Amino acid sequence: MIRKIFIFFFLLAFVNKGLAQLSKVHYIPPLTSGPSNADPLDQWFYISTPINGDVSFKIKPVGGTLDEEISYIVNNSNPKKILIANDGYSQLFQDPATTSVVTNNKGYIIESQDVIYVSVRMNAGGNAQAGALVSKGDNALGQLFRIGTYDNKGNPGNNYLNFFSVMATENQTTINLSNNNIAGLVIQNYSEQFPINNIILNKGESYTVALKVTDSEGNRDGLIGTLVSS
């Protein structure tokens, strides 16, 4: 069976990602962030639909109980703004010190009876910074990805962090990560280099790779071109 994965990739603390995609299922892997003025503050879901009638959807925190799954109603004149967390590491945000391991208690799966748009927005760093991402839904599922980020030129700050997150949509999904042969990378919570092979994920589980830019010269562009396959 070909197993599909969902992936997000980001530069520094956050990066905007295009237009949202209509879908009945949205996978939201965990994010992470740099320290200091990139610390996450308030975090929100923005959910809408072009459908005239009421559309029921459910937000399922990965690793949560049935009691923690919450249902909402949305229609084309009544979008929803839903608070995820007031600040800090949360169901959405993962401490970079805990990345590079299989994670089964971060991120979300959102299921709807009809198509919806899903985006996440947040403030950070004493409200001096903000970020957003949009979910591509089922259209973002695949078995092969290449990671791309901006170049980190000049004098990067201590809070600069490159990362990507992978979430499995099926049980017993094997993930392999290989980069573009940049040597001397310092990967958060991981003592070796790429390739990182045979990561086994069940549905909803995720794996995040993070590089603090100031840890090594290679970390500036160390994720560009990384191949993610399942």
What is each PLM-predicted segment?
Residues 1-23:
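Bacterial Sec-dependent N-terminal signal peptides
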Residues 21-230:
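Intrinsically disordered, low-complexity linker/terminal regions across diverse proteins
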